[in-house]
């Protein structure tokens, strides 16, 4: 089986349907004896350019190992699902399991924010003791 990287973008008004879509597409892959190496829900993000007068979309990334039939079925599902505004399936040489740069940057921002809020709490506690 080959390795694929799949990204699909969902209409921002349909964001509440994303978990169900992820589950359905994941089931399509696993039912065809495929494996999911990485699944990332990037959330709602700004588009580089408007698509159908939309400026934001909900992004989902999958790295999978699956047979061609499962990939064909996924592409058909993407094409006929009106909530999916764009999708891209790329074949890659190896399975990718580490976090993507998008998730790494998000985690770093969260860590900096947590560190800053802890430093704020410490300085406020120091002020009240004096």
Swiss-Prot record:
PROSITE patterns: RIBOSOMAL_S6. It comes from Yersinia pestis (strain Pestoides F). InterPro entries: Ribosomal_bS6, Ribosomal_bS6_CS, Ribosomal_bS6_sf, Ribosomal_S6_plastid/chlpt, Transl_elong_EF1B/ribsomal_bS6. This is Small ribosomal subunit protein bS6. Residues 104-116 have a biased composition (Basic and acidic residues). The gene is rpsF. GO terms for cellular component: cytosolic small ribosomal subunit. Residues 119-130 have a biased composition (Acidic residues). Coiled coil: none annotated. GO terms for molecular function: small ribosomal subunit rRNA binding; structural constituent of ribosome. Residues 100-130 are annotated as: Disordered. Keywords: Ribonucleoprotein, Ribosomal protein, RNA-binding, rRNA-binding. Belongs to the bacterial ribosomal protein bS6 family. It comes from the Bacteria. Binds together with bS18 to 16S ribosomal RNA. One of its GO terms (biological process) is translation.
